């Protein structure tokens, strides 16, 4: 018997694992089972600095401020200006998440590129503000709002999470413009994420793309069949 609630399927992995390419293929697979929507739920934290740089008058100055605060975040919260920029991106992500929930309420099968998590603060797809550090009252309040937002989003557990696991050398070769240290952290974190006990499928993303797509498609097919879709 087909499940009443449309499935929520997430694809996660480090940069260089091929998430976007896999999602582009999988949405065509998912659509065979019914009306579906692909939604990007990534925080896109790397875009914060690039977006700020484009702002008129103060863009470059703010970008430098954010970079300085990123180095200091282990010891204290950022200042008000970068904190507001971070909060604006959290609000943007919340809008996308609410759109995803609306799609489910409309009866659509949802495939997400990335998924928010509150399991590991500071990790990818998690909170930006560091926990349990000193800061001004206003920025501390913004940090608490971010934690609440991520806790709420993470409380909506996906039905299936496809993890694309990739080695550091492969990721670096695919993303030569990314910092090696950053990629290494993301790769190390991926196996630790459990998404509240969601069903997980691990895929070796070091393989040629064609085989990765075959494995991902099989994961979808097996899952949808078990949910009563044919």
From Swiss-Prot:
One example GO MF annotation: dTMP kinase activity
Keyword Transport: no
Positions with a binding annotation for ATP: 13-20
Gene Ontology annotations of biological process type: dTDP biosynthetic process; dTTP biosynthetic process; dUDP biosynthetic process
InterPro entries recorded: P-loop_NTPase
GO cellular component: cytoplasm; cytosol
Protein name: Uncharacterized ATP-binding protein YghT
């Amino acid at each position: 018997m087909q499940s009443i609630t449309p499935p929520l399927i997430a694809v996660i992995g480090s940069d260089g694992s091929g998430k976007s390419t896999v999602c582009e293929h999988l949405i065509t697979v998912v659509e065979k089972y019914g009306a579906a929507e692909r939604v990007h739920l990534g925080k896109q934290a790397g875009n914060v600095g690039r977006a700020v740089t484009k702002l008129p008058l103060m863009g470059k100055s703010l970008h430098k401020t954010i970079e300085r605060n990123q180095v200091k975040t282990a010891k204290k919260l950022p200042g008000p200006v970068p904190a507001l920029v971070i909060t604006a991106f959290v609000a943007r992500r919340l809008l996308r998440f609410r759109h995803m929930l609306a799609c489910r309420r409309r009866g659509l099968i949802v495939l997400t590129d990335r998924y928010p998590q509150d399991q590991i603060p500071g990790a990818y797809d998690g909170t930006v503000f560091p926990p349990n550090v000193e800061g001004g009252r206003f920025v501390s309040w913004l940090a608490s709002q971010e934690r609440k937002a991520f806790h709420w989003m993470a409380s909506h557990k996906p039905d299936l999470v496809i993890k694309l696991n990739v080695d550091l050398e492969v990721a670096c070769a695919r993303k030569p413009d990314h910092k090696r240290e950053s990629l290494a952290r993301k790769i190390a974190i991926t196996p630790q994420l459990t998404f509240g006990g969601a069903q997980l499928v691990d895929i070796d993303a070091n393989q040629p793309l064609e085989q990765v797509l075959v494995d991902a498609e099989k994961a979808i097919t097996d899952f949808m069949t078990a949910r009563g879709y044919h």
